[in-house]
Amino acid sequence: MSQLTYLFRSAPHGSAAGREGVDALLAASAYCEDITVIFIGDGVYQLLLGQEPSGILSKDYAPMLKLFDLYDIEQVFVCSESLAQRGLAQADLVIDAQALSLEQVKEKLQQAGKLLSF
């Protein structure tokens, strides 16, 4: 069972939810070693390479995603169906994330101790 599961399901830059979620995730990693991160639905866009949010006066927080390794956040997953529905592939992502089927994502969510959704 994962003690903390962070579920990213909203698109980036339309609101501060994604950035705040990444901030919370990195902060929590100092206190908790058992963290799972899942990107599903429009949340997969947060992992997309080549974003230029400065055009809409938004902060680019994609470099913060690359800190996951440094913070020992190793359980990072992306829903393969969400990628396919949006015409994306894992090569389009800014970080390596293990692809899971929707059914496998549901299993991970059922195993979550605490779930934080952004």
Swiss-Prot record:
Segments spanning the bilayer are none
One GO cellular component, as annotated? cytoplasm
What residue stretch is flagged as signal peptide?
A: none
Q: Which UniProt keywords apply?
A: Cytoplasm
Q: Which domain of life is it from?
A: Bacteria
* InterPro entries in alphabetical order: DsrEFH-like, Sulphur_relay_DsrE/F-like, Sulphur_relay_TusC/DsrF
What subcellular locations does the record give?
Answer: Cytoplasm
Principal localization reads cytoplasm
> According to its UniProt entry, what is the function of this protein?
Could be part of a sulfur-relay system.
Q: PANTHER family per the record?
A: PROTEIN TUSC
| Homology family | Belongs to the DsrF/TusC family.
Q: What is this protein called?
A: Protein TusC homolog
Organism of this sequence: Vibrio parahaemolyticus serotype O3:K6 (strain RIMD 2210633)
Q: What is the lineage of its organism?
A: Bacteria, Pseudomonadati, Pseudomonadota, Gammaproteobacteria, Vibrionales
